[in-house]
């Protein structure tokens, strides 16, 4: 089939003699030469490719190439190119960077590329995603706490406490007490009854309901309701608990990038002093 010296014996009418469905015959037309050559080239290419690149099991190929390695090389090249930009920010504190227009321009781009998907382009968040422009912080709002959050991430867990609180009526009473802490409309009688049962919640939120940043326990005495407001929303959280997570960015952003992003996030809820010329 390579040299073309072996051919199927053809009849006078250029058929192989095979007939189907009474009149369907197989013609003795050879494959085009270009098709045969292309097939041979394809086979050779596949063999060479299989030797050079990863193909079977743990075989890594002669070149040692991988898509992960190529991606990392491109990331390293990019980090090398932008290193001079961040070098001028390294000696400044987050508070100082927050007043530096060029640094905040970089910080805004970092935020839009890595944070806006959850917290929104205006940083005002959404249900279950905190508003970064107010003064309400689950884990602390100083630059050090923000940098820790960005670097390591946070895991917030509110255990289901319905059984610990008591009966469904007890849970409802606690919900009204929680609403009363922030001055929200509530049943004063139920709120008074729920106060005694609130001790099951006070271990994290405190007896005054103002929360504990060390635990990520929200302040229940303000008007910020991250996971929904109202009797039914609070009852649902008390009975079922709540889990929320903020992914760490250390594996995605460099330390210098996190430093600038910290300043940007801190500046969203603070008024930084303008940078000195």
Question: At which residue positions do the language-model features occur?
Answer:
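Residues marking the start of alpha-helices
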Residues: 27, 120, 134, 162, ...
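Sequence/structural segment immediately N-terminal to covalent heme-attachment motifs in c-type
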Residues: 99-124, 134, 140, 147-152, ...
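Periplasmic c-type cytochrome electron-transfer domains
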Residues: 1-99, 139-145, 149, 160-178, ...
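Axial heme c-ligation environment in periplasmic c-type cytochrome domains
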Residues: 126, 130-133, 151-171, 178-189, ...
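Gly/Thr/Ser/Pro-rich low-complexity intrinsically disordered regions
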Residues: 181, 227-228
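His/Cys-centered metal/cofactor-coordination and adjacent catalytic loops
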Residues: 66-103, 116, 120-137, 154, ...
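Hydrophobic alpha-helical transmembrane segments in multi-pass membrane proteins
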Residues: 42-45, 121, 156, 207
């Amino acid at each position: 089939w390579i040299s073309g010296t072996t051919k199927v014996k053809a009849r006078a009418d250029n058929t192989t003699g095979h007939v189907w469905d009474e009149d369907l015959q197989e013609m003795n037309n050879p494959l085009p030469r270009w098709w045969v050559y292309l097939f041979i080239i394809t086979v050779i290419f596949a063999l060479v490719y299989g030797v050079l690149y990863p193909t079977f099991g743990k075989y890594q190929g002669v070149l040692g190439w991988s898509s992960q390695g190529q991606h990392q090389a491109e990331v390293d090249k990019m980090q090398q190119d932008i290193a001079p930009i961040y070098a001028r920010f390294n000696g400044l504190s987050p508070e100082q960077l927050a007043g530096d227009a060029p640094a905040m321009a970089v910080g805004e781009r970092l935020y839009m590329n890595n944070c806006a998907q959850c917290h929104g382009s205006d940083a005002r968040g959404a249900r279950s995603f905190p508003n970064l422009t107010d003064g309400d912080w689950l884990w602390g709002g100083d630059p050090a706490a923000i940098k820790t959050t960005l670097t390591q991430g946070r895991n917030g867990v509110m255990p289901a406490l319905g059984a610990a609180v008591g009966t469904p009526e007890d849970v409802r009473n606690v919900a009204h007490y929680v609403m009363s802490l922030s001055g929200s409309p509530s049943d004063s009688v139920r709120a008074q009854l729920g106060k005694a049962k609130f001790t099951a919640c006070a271990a994290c939120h405190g007896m005054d309901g103002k929360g504990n940043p060390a635990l990520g326990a929200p302040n229940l005495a303000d008007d910020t309701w991250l996971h929904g407001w109202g009797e039914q929303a609070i009852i649902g959280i008390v009975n079922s608990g709540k889990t929320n997570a903020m992914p760490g960015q250390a594996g995605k952003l460099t330390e210098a990038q996190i430093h600038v992003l910290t300043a940007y996030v801190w500046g969203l809820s603070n008024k930084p002093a303008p940078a000195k010329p």
